[in-house]
Regions:
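Short acidic, hydrophobic short linear motifs in intrinsically disordered regions
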Residues: 63-71
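Amphipathic alpha-helical dimerization/coiled-coil segments
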Residues: 9-11, 17-31, 112-129
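Short alpha-helical segments that sit at the start of domains
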Residues: 26-53
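Basic amphipathic alpha-helical segments that dock to polyanions
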Residues: 58, 69, 84-90
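Short amphipathic alpha-helical interface segments
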Residues: 50-63
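Short, cationic-aromatic polyanion-contact patches
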Residues: 44-48, 65, 95-121
Length: 129
């Protein structure tokens, strides 16, 4: 079962971690988050109950177009397009072109695991703040 690991960290922490990785000073471990949000609130907005339900419908029904997904969900194509593009930026969904330019959504993970620090997080590869 594929699980996407998500973490919460400040912009400054994410930047420092990325630079440490780019310089070769830090190599992320296999179990570390692959996707980062700057707050639990931003994570909750992207993966709201409605959007998690949308991911479930995509995973279960495998719609071959946004038009079909709109039929299954009762949502407008324009709304779906915006939502899916946002989720694609975070890796929650993959969008590919089908026949005649249709957009085919796919969910590459069965689970999403959130690492939520209870104290000020210190990312591996960053200096102590």
């Amino acid at each position: 079962m594929r699980t996407l690991r998500v973490g919460i960290a400040s912009y400054e922490q994410m930047k420092a971690r990325t630079l440490a990785i780019a310089r070769g000073n830090y190599k992320p471990a296999a179990g570390e988050p692959k996707v980062w949000f700057t707050s639990a609130e931003s994570f909750a907005r992207v993966l709201s109950d409605r959007n998690r339900a949308l991911l479930g419908i995509i995973a279960e029904s495998g719609p071959e177009s946004l038009a079909r997904l709109a039929e299954l969900t009762g949502r407008k194509k324009s709304n779906l397009s915006r939502t899916l593009k946002t989720m694609e930026r975070y890796g929650f969904v993959q969008l590919s072109r089908g026949v005649r330019g249709s957009i085919i959504p796919r969910v590459p993970y069965q689970n999403i695991s959130l690492t939520l620090p209870l104290s000020k997080p210190r990312l591996p590869g960053t200096e102590a703040a």
